[in-house]
Amino acid sequence: MSETTRAWPADTLARVPFWVYQDEANYHAELRRIFEGPTWSYVCLESDVAKPGEFRTTFVGEMPVIVVRGQDGGVHAFENRCAHRGALIALDDAGSVKNAFRCVYHAWSYDLRGNLIGIAFEKGSNGRGGMPADFCKADHGPRKLRTTTLCGLVFATLAPDTPPIEEYLGAEILGRVRRVMGKPVQVLGRFTQGLPNNWKLYFENVKDTYHASLLHAFFGTFRITRLTQGGGVLVSPDGAHHVSYTIGVPEDARSAAYREQGIRSELDGFRLADARLLDSVDEFNDRIQLQILTVFPNLVIQQVQNSLAVRQILPKGVEAMELHWTYIGFADDDAEMRQRRLRQANLVGPAGYVSMEDGCVGGFVQRGAAAASDEVSVVNMGGEGTESMDTRATEASVRGFWKAYRRYMGH
């Protein structure tokens, strides 16, 4: 498929053309230049593949991938595609094998590094048929991905020149990853959520601190995050990664700002029937009650009070995507903390008090801009730059996303 020849409308990060969410050729260029390019894609947790032979299947862009713990103790990743006729090698979301994967179609087999090691009836039957004598199994196999691990997270890349993960993230973002993922984790549950919008609309959404207490009335009503509270936005120098955070400090007279804006949740005096939902503790000892962290191009790490989750963004065509949620706690959590995390999982998730709205608004934009390919969105809140700010009344991290995106795409 030929690449799009459409140009960005102006040399600014504060205007984004709507065709970027709609153009088929541009989408296929994204898969090649971003997801198959020099980026680190999150693929699973280390605990998902804790023992030799344990595996998970996932995607890098639209490429199906197997991630497996090798007998050597390393984590390996390779394309989930049989070298014979292209069928999936592993069909389950997760599982365990002893020493090899076997394709169900023609029983070709692969070791835990993705090397082709066996061909059914390779020598034929009764002296007839079989593969050519000069067929070399080492020359055939699925594509291999390099892997790296950080704080229990597994990342993969197809590119030989992707920098080390620590360099890729930068010191400030790296420190915030370690803040939340600093101990061995335990998986509490998983969801898969289908969204009717381009993948970039969701990634913009989680980088957009401006909307959090406006779209999500629950956040504002119960003071989980409000623009009048403490906090800010950290943006990596290349724009690719970000952290937004809210510090639980008294708002004093500034709390009147939401009433003055006519925000409905501020006027109706809503209350929870069961206040235990918001029973939280300052487990990181820094008063940060909400932190959303993104790693370009497909990872979100969430801390909303004591609800911790890893979200994986998977593109599924121009106008669709999947969001894979993994709720986590720490291996040393006591029963009370585990129950608290499970209860607070009702805050943020596909059917939670908050994220139902995020599941809708991307589709609203996809539909609303359907006939506006040559028009642009306005991303001016907080100026036109991508610098970190000590306020969340800004779209700096959204502009940072487009800064990185344009660099990878050549726009």
List where the protein language model places each region.
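Rieske [2Fe-2S] iron-sulfur-binding domain
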Residues: 49-160, 167, 171
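Short, charged helix-to-loop "capping" segments that act as catalytic/coupling loops
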Residues: 32-40, 93-100, 113, 124-130, ...
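Non-catalytic accessory segments flanking enzyme active sites
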Residues: 14-16, 20-60
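Short hydrophobic core segments
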Residues: 30, 81-82, 102, 202, ...
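Basic/polar N-terminal segments that are highly enriched at the extreme N-terminus
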Residues: 1-7, 407-411
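Short Pro/Gly-enriched beta-strand edge/turn motifs at strand-loop
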Residues: 37-48, 126-131, 292-297
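C-terminal catalytic domain of Rieske-type non-heme iron oxygenases
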Residues: 69, 74, 145-411
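Short, contiguous pre-domain boundary segments
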Residues: 4-17
